[in-house]
Amino acid sequence: FIKHVVYVIKENRTYDQVFGALQRGRGRADLCIFGAEITPNQHKLVSEFVLLDNTYCSGILSADGHQWSTTAFSTDYLEKSFAGFPRSYPDGMGEDGRDALAYSPAGFIWDAAQAKGLTIRNYGEFMMPKVRWRDPAKKGVPPFLACYRTWKGESADVIFESAPAIETIREFSPAGYVGWEMSVPDQARADFFLKELKQFEAQGTFPSLVIVCLPNDHTSGTSPNCPTPAACVADGDLAFGRIVEGLSRSKFWKEMAIFAIEDDPQAGWDHVSGYRTTAFCIGPHVKRGAVVSTQYNTTSLLRTMEQILGIPPMNQFDASATPMFDCFTDQADYAPYQSVPNNIPLDRMNPSPNAIRDPVLRQ
């Protein structure tokens, strides 16, 4: 049976943006901007495992999206903050993202896991970035290319670190894994994760609940000195594929299930609903090559993970959520996943606004 759950939280994509051109699912091709050329691993994963074409985010932006993704809840205070977020933007990604009034009184999924005596590892969720220059005389946040060169081993100019936004996660959240910081490539996150996976294999133990923040499919838009949106999404796709491959080739695979969803769908469009999103259910006990059109949302993923790990619901929302029974089979297939390389250069950068010749686009 399943003993290990890996929960990947990504950033801000809708179903049609990524899978709209897939004929197997309910999509609209003219809304697809990050198709198979940019997201080959995500397309391969939904081909080999299940394509979820009727799954929705519970949140609409990061402030409530990360609360729904980790607590299955959004407080009354947070809902009323949508008038302008006067006190904080409580996504847990920085100093202004810390706000106890936004946190569910029932706690987070890791609190529920701890109460059951389960082991946990949290990579980046509710961890504030402390990315900085190694030279203290240098000021400001290092730009993407400096971080990219540090990841590639071409320099050691940048230090990748983070700190917990919530003190209770410190003991199981490595400071070397950076959560939200778009200057840091998702490849650096995948490298960190896979390095620790090797250590877990050497020890012969793996946590019951693993949470992984992979934020770069959020993109930096068309901001100068940042990768293009396609490069950002390709970065996240490759990192996700590499992590799944590593897990599928580990000794823990036979007792594992991987779930992934966007924290919110804010940045995109969809012909069914602005809340419809990309979601994944992966593992040896998951159906192969199936389309699952059962209606699920963020709380469905949490409810399924809770049932697998024997964790009671945190509140009425996950208690009443539909578990993802339709994704699973009693005929296990232990074949590993083979990731595929990116087609888009990960360091393809946005042009300067001055390079845009069309006066309308320049504005």
Residue ranges and their predicted role:
Residues 1-363:
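N-terminal pro-sequences and low-complexity stem/linker regions of secreted or lumenal proteins
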